[in-house]
Amino acid sequence: AVLPPEQPTFYQALRDSGYRVGIVGKTDLHKRDTYCGVKGDMPSMYHYGFTDPVETEGKMNSAWYGTNPDGSIYPMGPYQKYLMDKDPELMRTLEKDYRSYMRQKPRYYAQPSVLPDEVFLDTFIGEKSLEWLNEHDNTGAPWHLTVSFAGPHNPWDPPKEDYDAVGDTLWPDPIPNDMEGKPAWIRRRAAQQTGGMTQADLQQVKRCYAGSVRVIDRWIGKLLDWLETSGHKDDTIVIFCADHGELLGDHGLLEKSCMYEGCLRIPLLVHLPGMTQRRDSDALAELMDLAPTCLELAGADWNRREMDAVSLVPVLNGSTEPLRPVQRSELHNCTMLFDGRYKWIRSYNDTDELYDLETDPQELHNVINEHPEVLNRMRPYSFRH
């Protein structure tokens, strides 16, 4: 996907309100080609509103370098340049490893990284994030930094020390791949992704996924330590979230790009200065709500009428009033609607699904033909943006 250049962003609003706006890591805002330049796609980053971007490649693009006519190689992104400055053989080793992953049938990858921890991609992102904070700490301007780790996206290849630290933990069995009531495209994808995989294979996937999370957890700890030692713990808002989950074998699926809970139900944690008590909320939030939330908390100028999102500030202040009647998500040719109990997955060229998450949290029983009143109530929200 490409964020249209004419689309206003909340990063621009923060910039125009006097903030230094940074990002370190994978942006995923533009995918025109695999070559973003050894400093990242700076024109696009500036246009989107970042004043001080440190863009990196994602997991797979980090391995595809360029080759000169004489056979020598050159970097196509910032992380590749970092590896090649260290040792060109690091780049060749990573590329060879990932190409073997692409040839696997079924195509899944779960083993420790061939790179040492000190040059692992998420280690690079963590180190660059600390550099960014130290560089902008004394500028006199407020700052907003997005740290976008590449993991735990597949390939699941944590540093060996994190893989070993996870150990032979016995992970819960995946949700059964009972395909009754599931659309044909889900059945096809399940056969492609996990057909032929054993329970031992799935345990290995989860071990590597957990190791990938462990890397990120370690670096988040270092970033929080920086806030403590720099004296910014009490004047910094911290938000932790993910963009999606992974199925890791649930319903016979491994990755993302579906509307089941393993993909959609992601963590969202917010800490405000002065907050001393944990508070949980089951409000129907969406990722886009972080935009008005950040703007309101930052005191930036913004127009509520220009956003479909809603600010989470009332929830953070203890409000229990609903944010919205229905939560909505879209993907390719399907739309998901969720009212806090019922989830309706509208597949426009396939079987619709309705799950009662109160009685069926594993989404095993499609009750699409049993609750016409639920569909009638949610239908108007299908076409709202």
Model regions and ranges:
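Formylglycine-dependent sulfatase
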Residues: 1-347, 352, 361-380
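Residues forming the ATP-binding cleft of Hanks-type serine/threonine protein kinase domains
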Residues: 358
